Amino acid sequence: MGNCVGRQRRERPAAPGHPRKRAGRNEPLKKERLKWKSDYPMTDGQLRSKRDEFWDTAPAFEGRKEIWDALKAAAYAAEANDHELAQAILDGASITLPHGTLCECYDELGNRYQLPIYCLSPPVNLLLEHTEEESLEPPEPPPSVRREFPLKVRLSTGKDVRLSASLPDTVGQLKRQLHAQEGIEPSWQRWFFSGKLLTDRTRLQETKIQKDFVIQVIINQPPPPQD
């Protein structure tokens, strides 16, 4: 993992008053997903909480807020397998990567920014849980009031899939439809739109999604059991 902050802690970037000298090289963002194991198994909700805590507090310590915002957007794009967008965000903000990962980055002033690995990919021992959201999910509206439209979702494998959806549909219902079409367990699916994670109870109409927009689906398939 190179210089990545692989433990569940993060090293603070160099303070702006004492910028570290930026590395002389800048490598393109690598497409390979970083693999790591948490010190303790965590649920998807716990992972989201840790990420929110980091992104909410990191700009308060040091560095420039616009750079943190760009790094957050690039991290979400990379995790959604849209590396072209992630690289464009980094280039637009003049962020350099000495090692080709978001673990260590520099802005044009030479300030260093370090992202913890849990902000870049989920751990291999992530607990896949069935939340109460599924059992509390509102019933589907009667077929007579459904106005269906093709919904395009892009899997983290790079494959595009079209689902038959309507605005009152919940993400949980669409996860099950994707499971029926592609055989991907709902508990393996994490849906993102505009950089935000969509919960199972979120209805499409709440996302303000428009025609031809794409929802990113990250697949966290558990590794096969080792003999």
Curated annotation (Swiss-Prot):
UniProt cross-references to PROSITE patterns, sorted A to Z: UBIQUITIN_2
The ranges of region (Disordered) come to 1-35
Where is the chain membrane-spanning?
none
Q: Which residues form the Ubiquitin-like domain?
A: 149-224
> Which one Pfam family would you cite for this protein?
ubiquitin
Coiled-coil stretches noted in the UniProt entry, renumbered to this chain: none
**Induction summary:** Induced by cytotoxic agents, it is also increased during premature senescence. the induction seems to be mediated by TP53.
> Per the record, where are the segments of Basic and acidic residues compositional bias?
24-35
CDD domains (UniProt xref): Ubl_UBTD1
Say what the protein does.
Answer: May be involved in the regulation of cellular senescence through a positive feedback loop with TP53. Is a TP53 downstream target gene that increases the stability of TP53 protein by promoting the ubiquitination and degradation of MDM2.
Assembly and partners?
A: Interacts with UBTD1.
The name under which this protein is listed is Ubiquitin domain-containing protein 1
Which source organism? Homo sapiens (Human)
